[in-house]
UniProtKB/Swiss-Prot annotation:
One of its GO terms (molecular function) is protein transmembrane transporter activity. It comes from Geobacter metallireducens (strain ATCC 53774 / DSM 7210 / GS-15). GO terms for biological process: protein transport by the Tat complex. This is Sec-independent protein translocase protein TatA. The gene is tatA. It is found in: Cell inner membrane.
């Protein structure tokens, strides 16, 4: 996983805890989760736009 092991993840978590504080961690985690969900939702969309021609009434009828 990107060359990051358990000791590195623990160090990163401790640094985040010191920088942001324990009170803001749930808020940050929620925002991060929402961002990831939105990114996945956007990337699941179609890459091309489908254009359907409009049906026009035939004036000769």
């Amino acid at each position: 996983m990107f060359g990051i092991g358990m000791p590195e993840l623990i160090v990163i978590l401790v640094i985040v805890l010191v920088v942001f504080g324990a009170g803001r961690l749930p808020e940050i985690g929620g925002a991060l989760g929402k961002s990831i969900r939105n990114f996945k939702k956007a990337s699941d969309g179609k890459d091309e736009i489908e254009i359907k021609p409009e049906k026009k009434d035939d004036p000769s009828k």
